[in-house]
Amino acid sequence: MSDKVKGKKQEEKDQSLRVQILVYRCMGIDLWSPTMANDRPWLTFVTMGPLFLFMVPMFLAAHEYITQVSLLSDTLGSTFASMLTLVKFLLFCYHRKEFVGLIYHIRAILAKEIEVWPDAREIIEVENQSDQMLSLTYTRCFGLAGIFAALKPFVGIILSSIRGDEIHLELPHNGVYPYDLQVVMFYVPTYLWNVMASYSAVTMALCVDSLLFFFTYNVCAIFKIAKHRMIHLPAVGGKEELEGLVQVLLLHQKGLQIADHIADKYRPLIFLQFFLSALQICFIGFQVADLFPNPQSLYFIAFVGSLLIALFIYSKCGENIKSASLDFGNGLYETNWTDFSPPTKRALLIAAMRAQRPCQMKGYFFEASMATFSTIVRSAVSYIMMLRSFNA
């Protein structure tokens, strides 16, 4: 039986990766395959093509509005979001074979642990449920932001009609085009282009981010299983006792290697996610403060909310891996180490020294942690106030 068939059968059984499989299918990508053999490339082209082309009018708009803080902040918020999505798409394409291989590798490790220690199933199920709940919440928040973006122009039209003002056709995202957008025959296809670009930006971001959730929660499951096996390690003495300890330490080592591998592949993305999200929160937060309580501010509120949630979840994933890796060290002290034989105690001492060094997900200058999240939010609020003073 092929790895792909095994993976699909196991997915049907434990119901993990459901959200990830769905969002990747929406982009025409088969997450179970390390190649494009089972993809629908036409769907990927139809979704990502408009987003790549959409960067041109947005860059032109950023240049056009360079002296207008309000319009520039609106334009740059969308531009940075699109740029980040394109980076995520290219990152997945470049590392696809490794990511898919890592999925099978993690699932094989966990399946083997269930055979060795049946109680591991409960830990794995809890972590996968948390992953799916987080991925589903994340999907809903980003979907809501996309819906608000599509509806934003109609809110302006309705308000203009109620006030009796002249109707001015607007787009979900600012851009500069070589034709008059007030002409309906030009406006409609451009609006659809904007909506398709929004769909691509939201869905591709969900693909790569939700896959990170799967990796982090399952690595945490490996660390937790290693901790519980360590706590319940019997003090039987002799070679059998030492062999049992070695098996647990090997499992912990696998978790460390996978965590380091994930951190290495996601390092550029973590850096851009934190850096660009901080800039986006500044610019879009300025729009919220400038427009509130205008109904059009609902879109920007949803946008800022999705940015904060994305930043929070990245920080939470990094914090979870860090805590789980350190928690394994606590498990070493909860064992019956006083009853172990001298060779086992010596091995346990070395393991305790290594467990003091946590796994960290870093994006060069940024560590994915709750402390970094708090710092960015506090700094963003200060910059929003500064932008408001420029616009006063």
Curated annotation (Swiss-Prot):
Q: Name one Pfam family in it.
A: 7tm_6
- Disulfide linkages recorded for this protein, renumbered to the chain, are none
Please list every transmembrane segment annotated in the UniProt record, as residue ranges.
42-62, 75-95, 142-162, 203-223, 269-289, 298-318, 363-383
Sorted keywords for this record are: Cell membrane, Membrane, Olfaction, Receptor, Sensory transduction, Transducer, Transmembrane, Transmembrane helix
Per the record, membrane topology reads: Multi-pass membrane protein
Q: Name one GO biological process term.
A: detection of chemical stimulus involved in sensory perception of smell
- In which tissues or organs does this protein occur? Expressed in olfactory sensory neurons in the antenna.
Coiled coil start-end: none
Q: Does the keyword Transmembrane apply?
A: yes
For this UniProt entry, the molecular function terms from Gene Ontology, in alphabetical order, are:
ionotropic olfactory receptor activity; odorant binding; olfactory receptor activity
Concerning InterPro entries, the annotation shows: 7tm6_olfct_rcpt
Intracellular or extracellular location(s): Cell membrane
Ranges per topology, Cytoplasmic:
1-41, 96-141, 224-268, 319-362
Annotated Gene Ontology cellular component terms: dendrite membrane; plasma membrane
Is Phosphoprotein found in the keyword set?
Answer: no
Q: How does it assemble?
A: Interacts with Orco. Complexes exist early in the endomembrane system in olfactory sensory neurons (OSNs), coupling these complexes to the conserved ciliary trafficking pathway.
Q: Which family does it belong to?
A: Belongs to the insect chemoreceptor superfamily. Heteromeric odorant receptor channel (TC 1.A.69) family. Or1a subfamily.
Note in the entry: The atypical heteromeric and topological design of the odorant receptors appears to be an insect-specific solution for odor recognition, making the OR/Orco complex an attractive target for the development of highly selective insect repellents to disrupt olfactory-mediated host-seeking behaviors of insect disease vectors. Odor-evoked OR currents are independent of known G-protein-coupled second messenger pathways.
* Protein role: Odorant receptor which mediates acceptance or avoidance behavior, depending on its substrates. The odorant receptor repertoire encodes a large collection of odor stimuli that vary widely in identity, intensity, and duration. May form a complex with Orco to form odorant-sensing units, providing sensitive and prolonged odorant signaling and calcium permeability.
Q: PANTHER family per the record?
A: ODORANT RECEPTOR, ODORANT RECEPTOR 47A-RELATED
What is the designated name of this protein?
Odorant receptor 9a
Q: What is the lineage of its organism?
A: Eukaryota, Metazoa, Ecdysozoa, Arthropoda, Hexapoda
Gene name, please? Or9a
